[in-house]
Every structure is written in C-alpha cells, then in structure tokens.
C-alpha cells in the first residue's frame, strides 16, 4: 500500500469515521456503533485502509458490550479490526461529484483474514471526501463463536455500515 505524499496529494484521511453493525433476529435486534475509525484513501492508486479498536463499539446495554468484548470478539486477544484494499476503479474519480465504486481487499477480524468485495459511494467535494459502504459479515467466516444459549438472539450474518468524512492531507 502506498500512502507517501507528493506535491499534488490525492490522499485523504480521517480519525473519527463511523462503523455501525446490526444483528436482526426474531427474538431481538442488536446494534452497536463506534466513531473512532481511522482511515486513509489514496485516490491516485486506489489504496484504502480502515482500522478500528474493537472495544470502542458502544451498545444500548452495557451487558451486551461486555459480552461482545469478552466472549465473542475477545478484544483483549484481538484488539483491532482492519480492512486493507483497493478501489478497483479509482481513475473514474475525476473532480467533484458522487461516484459508485467497487472495493476489494482483506478484512481482519478476530484474528481471521478474509477477502471481501463490496460497493461504496464516494462523494468528492474539493478538499473533502465522504464514503459510505454497506456489507455483510458472516460470524463463522471470522471464527466468532456464539454460545448456543444465546444463539437465537444473535444473527449469523451481521450487517455493517461504514461512513466517514475525510479531509485532504496537506503537503508542506
């Protein structure tokens, strides 16, 4: 991944991006959110990275947050989730506008790395860039085990939404 700056920087970063996830079952819905996502995007070559500390996700119920960190995600053992990838068609992003792009990369969660391809929307407006992406994660793909006693309360597939407002990296 290449994020070195040059005179005409096309690199954008953010330290307070947002990730929400949603689990829907007939018994209960569970939602969590963090606004502590760090990310960088290089529009010249399409490189993209997102990184989040697992224990920053907040739940409506403290007990859910505790179970999430201690029992399911084991956030002491696996403190971060990270996506490294590429915008597959970065050359289409020319000037201000809204762009629908394909993103491919590797998602590391719970010590397991899997390949993902998803769609994202990028809005470029001068020195600011915003992104939105929605995708699903299967718990089994990342070896996240849910005890059978609560298995009906947690979906096997979690809906994830990433949204971030980036600023252009200033070059000295």
At which residue positions do the language-model features occur?
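Low-complexity, acidic/polar, glycine-enriched regions of mature
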Residues: 7-172
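C-terminal segment of classical bacterial N-terminal signal peptides
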Residues: 1-6
